[in-house]
């Protein structure tokens, strides 16, 4: 693992942190089944000035396993998010599994964070995770991320 490689990073959850979720806490879809990417308030304003940092998206998407989404549609949504943010993302990890799979990548486990840290030489103890749920905080802790901040506090939501 690359905990001491020297590069701090910002890890962000996707739905409910960077983009809007639907009423079932899933990524919203249009009539053709494409993910609707609607930035949440303050996201672009807060993240765009941080473009000199490594910024990653990590997301649980059990809808892939269940057939509601495809990996390609989630990747397209993250690419659209990146365009809306001004091409600031360094990378992303998607967990397509559900809880029954007991995989190492699904939050609250830290596998997605650890994978990105190893690939990009991230110093996890100097890094930050932003998320909207307790599983995000647990994943940050499991991976050894130095600081966790809830999205409402990071982006200044009421």
Regions found by a protein language model. Name each.
Residues 16, 59, 139-140:
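Hydrophobic alpha-helical segments that mediate membrane insertion or helix-helix packing
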Residues 2-10, 49-51, 72-75, 79-91, ...:
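Asp-based, Mg2+/Mn2+-dependent phosphohydrolase catalytic module
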Residues 60-74:
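A short secondary-structure junction motif
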Residues 57-60, 128-130:
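Acidic beta-strand-to-loop metal/phosphate-binding motif
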Residues 27-30, 64-68, 98-103:
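A short acidic, helix-capping loop that chelates divalent metal ions and anchors anionic groups
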Residues 19-21, 66, 138:
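Conserved protein kinase catalytic core
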Residues 95:
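Beta-strand-loop-alpha "switch" segments that mediate conformational coupling across diverse proteins
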Residues 1-56:
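Active-site neighborhood of HAD-like aspartate-dependent phosphohydrolases
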